[in-house]
Amino acid sequence: MKTMEIKKLLRKIDEFKIITLPAIFVVFILFVLILGFYFFNALPAIERYGIDLFITNVWKAAEEPAKEVYGLAAPIWGSIYTATIAVLIALPLSICYAIFVNDYAPKRLKYPLIVISDIMAGLPTIIYGIWGAFILVPLLRDHIMKFLYEHFSFIPLFDYPPLSGYCYLSAGILLGIMVTPFAAAIIREAYAMIPSVYKEGLVALGATRYETTKVLIKYIRPAIISGLILAFGRALGETVAVSLVIGNSFNLTYKLFAPGYTISSLIANQFGNAVLYEYMTSVLYSAGLVLFVIGLVVNIIGIYYLKRWREHVSH
């Protein structure tokens, strides 16, 4: 009798659940440890400078700890600003790509386009960074920035002289190119998942191809929002490529042609020197903590919208 009861109990146990639970636990513990690591290392700087660490724009390293003054407003702004530019560029490109691949591309061209997009999404960032520094920046400076500055400098966005071309605009455009394949993959899959009955119904009602596409784009709006939010989160964390094209200067400005900093580029450029100063290392950990929290919030929102879309499609 006992043997039969044990067998029945074993049948009810989900072996895969038992196997996967430790992995989930390990991932959760790693998440907590990383967050705790950043918080405790950032604590000395937060205790010393308080809220001013995040709302002021200053970077004065000194051998005497009492003379050290730091403020992360410019890098925080730079991260959000360049990521926003990137998303504005990725939005039309990724939607057009998804529509073309699903509705217009010949069968022989469809698969190569998907493969190329996936390859671009997986390229090392240094590849984009070198290309951006030596090709994209001179191209933008000589043919776009100078033209906009000469003819439209009365607009505040364009009234900063584009001396080197290494600026917020260059970083934003490069990031836009980098995250477009990522956003496009999500939007492409969402567009492909639209039930054929919707397309057939629209055609039966006499809708043109343009009108059909317009309606279908509205149908996948949650997936588009999700893809762009996740692309924004990815753009926030890009380091090497941005460091090579943004100019690395503490400018708290909305002027597109001004050099700037992002949190990632600040950490990459200053971490090697941080050990020479009392508080700089802790300040950089504070910057990393800010990036961690922003990225976490952005990704949670993006995943929420993606989940909503999947639930909508399943029903």
Curated annotation (Swiss-Prot):
InterPro entries: MetI-like, MetI-like_sf, Phosphate_PstC, Phosphate_Transport_Permease. It is a multi-pass membrane protein. One of its GO terms (cellular component) is plasma membrane. Keywords: Cell membrane, Membrane, Phosphate transport, Transmembrane, Transmembrane helix, Transport. One of its GO terms (biological process) is phosphate ion transmembrane transport. Residues 76-302 form the ABC transmembrane type-1 domain. Its main location: membrane. It holds the Pfam family BPD_transp_1. GO terms for molecular function: phosphate transmembrane transporter activity. PROSITE patterns: ABC_TM1 (PS50928). It comes from the Archaea. SUPFAM superfamilies: MetI-like. NCBIfam families: phosphate_pstC (TIGR02138). Belongs to the binding-protein-dependent transport system permease family. CysTW subfamily. Part of the binding-protein-dependent transport system for phosphate; probably responsible for the translocation of the substrate across the membrane. This is Probable phosphate transport system permease protein PstC. The gene is pstC.
